Each structure stands twice: as C-alpha cells, then as structure tokens.
C-alpha cells in the first residue's frame, strides 16, 4: 500500500496539518516507509501464539507510588523568579 500526493493532502486536511510544498516528498516517503513496516508486521505468522499467552508473563512496569522527600516552601520559592502570597507570579497570557 502506498500513499500518493492526493492521499497525503486528504490526511493533512483531516488532521488539520499544513504540509509545505518542500516537505511533501519527504513526508510521502516517511508515510510509505511506515506503511511498508506495517505490511511486514501484518505478514508475520503469529498462529502459534495463543491470545492469552501475551498476558501471562506481563509484570507491572510502573514503579510503586511511594511518598518521598518533599521540598519546603522556601525551596520552592527559591526556584521561582517571582513568588507572592504563596503563588507563582507569571506574565499575563490571556488578554481580557
């Protein structure tokens, strides 16, 4: 399966991306490489793998949620260029 320029344009429109004309060829090549890889994966013989075997040896890779040392208010204040009444002071972003 290959993506042509028309398909790339449709994908860009659907995903609200703007692909500059000088990027189109490289983007097409990248998409097509990804699709070739997906085709390789689709071609693998996985008939010998049972569905439930995938999950049998799975261990939780997430570390335990343990409380640790925390920073004091003074330490936190020292990181900020401006800190007032217990809050970080930042430049105004939204005009009202």
Swiss-Prot record:
Disulfide bonds: none annotated. Its EC number is 6.3.5.-. One of its GO terms (molecular function) is glutaminyl-tRNA synthase (glutamine-hydrolyzing) activity. One of its GO terms (biological process) is regulation of translational fidelity. Keywords: ATP-binding, Ligase, Nucleotide-binding, Protein biosynthesis. It catalyses: L-glutamyl-tRNA(Gln) + L-glutamine + ATP + H2O = L-glutaminyl-tRNA(Gln) + L-glutamate + ADP + phosphate + H(+); L-aspartyl-tRNA(Asn) + L-glutamine + ATP + H2O = L-asparaginyl-tRNA(Asn) + L-glutamate + ADP + phosphate + 2 H(+). The keyword DNA-binding does not apply. InterPro entries: Asp/Glu-ADT_sf_sub_c (IPR036113), GatC (IPR003837). Gene3D superfamilies: Glu-tRNAGln amidotransferase C subunit, N-terminal domain. It comes from the Bacteria. Signal peptide: none annotated. It is an enzyme of class 6 (ligase). Belongs to the GatC family. Allows the formation of correctly charged Asn-tRNA(Asn) or Gln-tRNA(Gln) through the transamidation of misacylated Asp-tRNA(Asn) or Glu-tRNA(Gln) in organisms which lack either or both of asparaginyl-tRNA or glutaminyl-tRNA synthetases. The reaction takes place in the presence of glutamine and ATP through an activated phospho-Asp-tRNA(Asn) or phospho-Glu-tRNA(Gln). Heterotrimer of A, B and C subunits. This is Aspartyl/glutamyl-tRNA(Asn/Gln) amidotransferase subunit C. It comes from Leptospira interrogans serogroup Icterohaemorrhagiae serovar Lai (strain 56601). The gene is gatC.
């Amino acid at each position: 399966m290959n993506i042509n320029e028309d398909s790339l344009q449709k994908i860009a429109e659907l995903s609200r991306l703007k692909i500059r004309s000088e990027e189109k060829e490289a983007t097409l090549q990248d998409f097509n490489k990804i699709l070739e890889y997906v085709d390789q994966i689709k071609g693998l013989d996985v008939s010998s793998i049972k569905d439930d075997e995938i999950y049998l040896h799975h261990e939780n890779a997430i570390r335990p949620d343990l409380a640790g040392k925390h920073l004091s208010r003074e330490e936190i204040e020292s990181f900020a260029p401006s800190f007032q009444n217990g809050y970080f002071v930042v430049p105004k972003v939204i005009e009202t």
